[in-house]
């Protein structure tokens, strides 16, 4: 039987590096560096060099961060659990917390909105960035899904601007218009008791009502 010692040594390091880059993609550089108690400069160097220190390989810190996303600690006193998608700075969340809800997962891609959100809410779970990259296994079970998905592809002003620029709108806008289908993907996988989708008035009449019909049928 042959034994490749160097390969065995590489495998744990590779696994940890893959975990590190996955978290970097999920929650961003600033949050990850803060959670690891290192500078963003150090984090960039680890990723650039594809190398992380021995103590990180032997420790469980990366697994703990994944755990805080998928299974955050919750209060015994909350009436229900909800997730906050396309969260902005947390305006919708405020109302549902006021009636006893507890937020167990947050997604917001804009780093400036993230910064304000984190100042508004001291959570035990990090904010996930691009929801399109999130496997539903990483989303905790919840009773209610909140999603204020982008309105620009559907609003009167947004559609008018895109038309003037010769750009697609509605579901044809592949940067923002298709994000509803990520909401659908999560609802299908997690089966919350209820969901609330917030958008503009024109959503119901966009594309002669066909857009809203697709949403209702989904």
Each model region followed by its residue ranges:
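Conserved active-site and SAM-binding loop architecture
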Residues: 1-218
């Amino acid at each position: 039987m042959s034994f490749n010692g160097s390969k065995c040594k590489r495998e744990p390091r590779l696994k940890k590096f893959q975990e590190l880059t996955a978290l970097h993609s999920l929650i961003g550089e600033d949050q990850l560096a803060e959670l690891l108690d290192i500078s963003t400069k150090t984090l960039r160097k680890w990723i650039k060099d594809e190398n992380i220190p021995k103590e990180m390989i032997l420790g469980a810190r990366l697994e703990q961060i994944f755990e805080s996303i998928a299974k955050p600690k919750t209060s015994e006193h909350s009436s229900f659990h909800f997730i906050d998608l396309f969260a902005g700075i947390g305006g919708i969340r405020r109302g549902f917390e006021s009636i006893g809800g507890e937020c167990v997962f947050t997604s917001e891609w804009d780093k400036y909105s993230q910064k304000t959100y984190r100042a508004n809410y001291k959570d035990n779970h990090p904010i996930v960035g691009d929801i399109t990259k999130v496997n539903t296994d990483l989303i905790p079970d919840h009773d209610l899904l909140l999603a204020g998905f982008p309105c620009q592809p559907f609003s009167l002003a947004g559609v008018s601007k895109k038309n003037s620029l010769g750009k697609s709108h509605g579901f044809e806008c592949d940067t923002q218009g298709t994000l509803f289908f990520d909401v659908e993907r999560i609802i299908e996988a997690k089966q919350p008791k209820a969901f609330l989708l917030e958008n503009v008035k024109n959503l119901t009449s966009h594309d002669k009502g066909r857009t809203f019909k697709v949403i209702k049928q989904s």
